[in-house]
């Protein structure tokens, strides 16, 4: 079985392994086929990232432009509630998701 990773903004493009065509949201790595789709994703990640896991309580949710968020170590973190965002800010190293690029 062949598996390919597609660009989340333009599924016609294959995601690149190049470090300059990658972006993190909640610690998850997203890969892009070109700079244009990467820039578009970075402007509004909540439109393209799909379901996320709140790094504090593990709940799954679909972020929106109104979702609580903070920027930490290379990308945005979205939260299911203000209370989990506040807990994250109290000790971000504890909740940071670490994934290798």
Locations of regions flagged by a protein language model:
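Short loop/beta submotifs within extracellular cysteine-rich repeat domains
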Residues: 15, 38-41, 84-89, 95-97
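Residues immediately within or flanking Cys/His clusters that coordinate Zn2+
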Residues: 4, 51
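Cys/His-rich microdomains that often coordinate metals
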Residues: 14, 61
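Short, structured interface segments
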Residues: 27-49
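Short cysteine-rich clusters marking metal-coordination/redox-active sites
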Residues: 7-10, 23, 54-57
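Short cysteine/histidine-rich zinc-coordinating motifs and their immediately flanking basic loops
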Residues: 19-25, 66-72
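Hydrophobic core segments of beta-strands in well-ordered, beta-rich domains
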Residues: 31-32, 78-80
């Amino acid at each position: 079985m062949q598996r390919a990773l597609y660009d989340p903004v333009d599924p016609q493009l294959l995601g690149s392994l190049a470090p300059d065509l990658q972006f993190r949201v909640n610690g998850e790595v997203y890969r892009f086929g070109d700079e244009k789709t990467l820039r578009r994703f970075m402007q509004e990640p909540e439109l393209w990232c799909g379901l996320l896991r709140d790094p504090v309580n593990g709940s799954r949710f679909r972020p929106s432009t109104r979702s609580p968020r903070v920027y930490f170590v290379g990308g945005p973190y979205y939260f299911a509630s203000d209370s989990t965002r506040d807990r994250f800010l109290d000790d971000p190293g504890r909740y940071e998701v670490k994934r290798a690029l």
